[in-house]
């Protein structure tokens, strides 16, 4: 039987980190992930999600492996099923001021602090701990290994995509509705033609684009 779109064949291991944390006595375990480190324009967005113990949904996976339609569908399901959800958004001006890594960690921190229920343990996608006192574990490629982090990746991705769709209406010449701020060839050519707008990241040197596009993965 073919797998459903986006389903994870390794789902049996997607809750391993959560189970270990529950066995260690933690009750509210939040997965934390971010979207938007690589784009030339727009904010970085993070989400934190606390799912019920033993929660199973075989379609929840790394948001990058899902279609936009599937992400929207799962976004609604996660909002319905989750114990708590928080989001953090750091704008372009702040990214340029403090750098993208610090902005990413700030967005993650804001997402955790926005949770209506305080988590007692965090599973964080990536290498870095975030600046909160809550016990935490960074997990490399966590959005493919932890259902909580995967859920957070979906919430963050859909949230950011919706923000970029709003910006598209303000700055249609850059086609943000399609590229979401990433450095596609079309986007780079638009910058060369029209210059930058207020949501472009000056610290990413978008004023000095060469003829070839900057390679980022949307």
Regions picked out by a protein language model, each given a short descriptive name:
Residues 1-218:
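RNase H-like, Mg2+-dependent phosphodiesterase core
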